[in-house]
């Protein structure tokens, strides 16, 4: 699997971070949206990619109990593209630098990104993309037995090498099954089970038979889509994780217009309709509307709608185009050239004879009007 040594920029703060893309993007891939990865091969002779001076299993900081600005474990949940990853970066940097959230919120975004990458390089932050590690499961995360060898997983290695200061494991885009990575070690996540606490707990690992503990200076920050994290699952981990909700912020788009389109009104209207049909978790974050560079911004908006938004709506509505048309306002548009999904009428005589009563005689079919995506009026008519 790959442990990310960089990060892909979250669109919700793309406008703030644009000026830093040239300096940070080259090292991290943030400018292109593509993570830079360092492949860690888990073998008995593997080379740990972080400095040797991080090895200090008996360092007193591992038992630190006085730092209270952040909980040991944080799960940031919210709808798609609401800035969860940005919040996770701010949290991780704040933990290491000892700055609370208010102080982090006034830090210039380029500085935060630069510090984040610095701490990844120094081995203070372990950035894990959950989809990458999920396929390897517990074996790649904690440990596995391969023949006569015991191979340490990425999380176990990182936890064992926490030394002075504070360390953060960043887990991006976890899903309902993510706790299976921890298995029996999940009990160690709880704050009062960490090293140096009155209820310090050690687990005997199944393959190595080693006593495994989690240091108190190790913090976990995870992000998840609110759609995949059901309340029942969150309730099962709320004793171990502080759950921080993140909501869409259309006010960020205040005053922003593209070809006469009010991005704030567009986002607000679509989200209200989505909430009506599907619930509050099914909303669009401001990141959808901040992906456009200043030049060619309308074309970028068109492509976001056609290539990202429409497929997402089709997934959420299980292909029910009629309800998607209501979300996009197609049902009330007067001009055919602004309708994204146009109804195709059945011609007379399509079938020979009358259809049986058991057939759906009210069925409708639609075609996607590609030209509508490149017409500013199509978007204005969604909310106007």
For each predicted feature, which ranges?
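C-terminal regulatory/interaction module of P-loop NTP-utilizing enzymes
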Residues: 1-7, 11-384
């Amino acid at each position: 699997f790959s442990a990310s040594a960089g990060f892909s920029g979250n669109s919700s703060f793309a406008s703030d971070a644009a000026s830093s893309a040239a300096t940070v993007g080259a090292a991290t891939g943030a400018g292109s949206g593509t993570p830079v990865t360092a492949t860690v091969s888990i073998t008995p002779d593997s080379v740990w990619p972080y400095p040797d001076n991080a090895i200090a299993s008996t360092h007193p900081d591992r038992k630190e109990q006085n730092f209270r600005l952040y909980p040991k474990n944080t799960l940031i949940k919210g709808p798609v593209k609401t800035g969860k990853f940005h919040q996770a970066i701010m949290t991780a940097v704040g933990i290491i630098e000892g700055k609370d959230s208010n102080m982090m919120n006034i830090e210039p975004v380029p500085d935060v990104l630069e510090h984040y990458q610095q701490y990844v390089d120094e081995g203070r932050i372990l950035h894990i993309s959950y989809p990458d590690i999920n396929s390897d499961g517990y074996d790649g995360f904690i440990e596995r037995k391969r023949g006569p060898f015991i191979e340490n997983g990425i999380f176990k290695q990182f936890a064992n090498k926490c030394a002075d200061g504070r360390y953060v494991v960043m887990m991006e885009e976890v899903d309902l099954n993510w706790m299976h990575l921890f298995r029996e070690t999940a009990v160690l996540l709880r704050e009062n089970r960490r090293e140096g606490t009155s209820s310090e707990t050690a687990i005997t690992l199944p393959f190595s038979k080693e006593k495994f503990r989690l240091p108190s200076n190790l913090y976990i920050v995870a992000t998840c889509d609110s759609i995949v994290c059901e309340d029942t699952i969150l309730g099962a981990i709320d004793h171990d994780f502080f759950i921080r909700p993140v909501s869409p912020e259309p006010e960020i788009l205040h005053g922003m217009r593209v070809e006469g389109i009010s991005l704030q009104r567009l986002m607000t209207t679509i989200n209200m309709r989505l909430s009506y049909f599907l619930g509050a978790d099914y909303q669009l974050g401001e990141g959808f509307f901040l992906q456009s560079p200043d030049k060619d911004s309308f074309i970028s908006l068109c492509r976001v709608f056609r290539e990202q938004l429409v497929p997402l709506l089709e997934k959420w509505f299980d292909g029910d185009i009629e309800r998607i048309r209501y979300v996009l306002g197609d049902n009330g548009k007067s001009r055919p050239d602004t309708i994204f999904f146009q109804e195709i009428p059945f011609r007379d005589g399509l079938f020979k004879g009358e259809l049986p009563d058991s057939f759906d005689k009210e069925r409708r079919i639609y075609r996607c009007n590609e030209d509508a995506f490149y017409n500013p009026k199509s978007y204005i008519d969604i909310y106007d």
